[in-house]
Amino acid sequence: DMGASVMMPIIFTLLGLIMGAKFGEALRAGMTFGVGFLGLNTIIGLMSATISPVATALVENLNFKLTAIDIGWATGSAIAWSTEAVPFVFIAVIITNILMILLGWTKTMDVDIWNYWHVLFSASAILLACGVNNVLAWVFAIGQAMVLMGITFIMADYSQADYAEVFGLEGISIPHCQTVSILLYTYPIDWLLNKIPGVKDIHWTSEGIAEKLGLLGEPIMMGFIIGGFLAALAHFTTHGVSIAAAIQQIFIVGMNVAAVLVLIPRMVSLLMEGLMPISEMTQAFLEKRFPGRELYIGLDSAVATGHTFVISLGLIAIPIVLILAVVLPWNVVLPLGDLATLPFFAVPCVVASKGNLFRGIIEMIVI
């Protein structure tokens, strides 16, 4: 009930103490991480509050004739954490992680327990389909959760070097089921793009764009332009909205998105300031007792949203996703609830493309 912003400092303080840190050092690191985590979630909340009305207006104005509505991850996670499967799957996943670490099958120590909701949801769906009184259904539900999280831990290890290179997340992996599942597509797509003559030579990096565009290539201006464009697209197509009101919304949304692109990297930096001492203590603890062993701290993909292209790509994808929803045959789902969280879908695209916006856009369209 206290939420991640309270529990994470407690977890990291205890972890620091276990690793041999003094109480003051462990508490400072845990509190700093908690403040950064709370700040990061606050800014992400600002982004969602800003973009959700814009996305809703776009959907309403385009008058889509789709029969099912995307209700978003928040509803899905709330459902997942409220079923009979929770205690059994939760314990099974923790045991799986511990066993895999002890056996040397993974280097990821997953402390991002809130995102267990993915496997909780799939386990609950199995029980709903087969019945909670079916013993085989329980075996399958728990078994699939353990296998899925096992694959997630392995993929988190595999992608860790890329997260360190692109986002500077040293000693951190992302055992996030959604992110890992998308990486299974973006890595092969990036490999294929690297084989196409001409395409493989296109590199749109944040540094290159900033150099070519000057002021317009800076995060604050990119945020204002992208946010303003989306607001214009939404409000100038709304019947009965005055030009003055539309222009007002363009500036409001533009400034809010600009603030998001500037503030998120700073919150991630504060989060990392608290995390790095714990990570270093963990590595020192392992080196002393298990020479040659390495351990990554598994966190939510939110810590990777500090890269300018993650937010930018997620926002650019909103109109693309809406167009695809209409033109793709047999699609009946109206994208809505998760439109504001598309930057989280952009994370594995930026990772696989090594921060190349051109490839990231292609990968985002495909997934």
Label every PLM stretch briefly.
Residues V135, Q248-L261, G314-V321, V332-I367:
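Alpha-helical transmembrane segments of secretory-pathway, organelle, and plasma-membrane proteins
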Residues A29, G36-P87:
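Membrane helical hairpin/interfacial module
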Residues A302-G314, I318-L322:
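N-terminal signal-anchor transmembrane alpha-helix
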Residues D1-I43, E84-Y296, D300, A304-T308, ...:
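Signature of multi-pass transmembrane helix bundles
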Residues A49, W73, V262, R266, ...:
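A short glycine-/small-residue-rich loop at the edge of a beta-strand within enzyme catalytic domains
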Residues I71-G72, I91-V93, G360-I365:
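Alpha-helical transmembrane segments of multi-pass membrane proteins
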Residues F64-I71, V89-F90, A284-E287, F309-I316:
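A broadly tuned preference for mixed-charge, low-complexity surface segments
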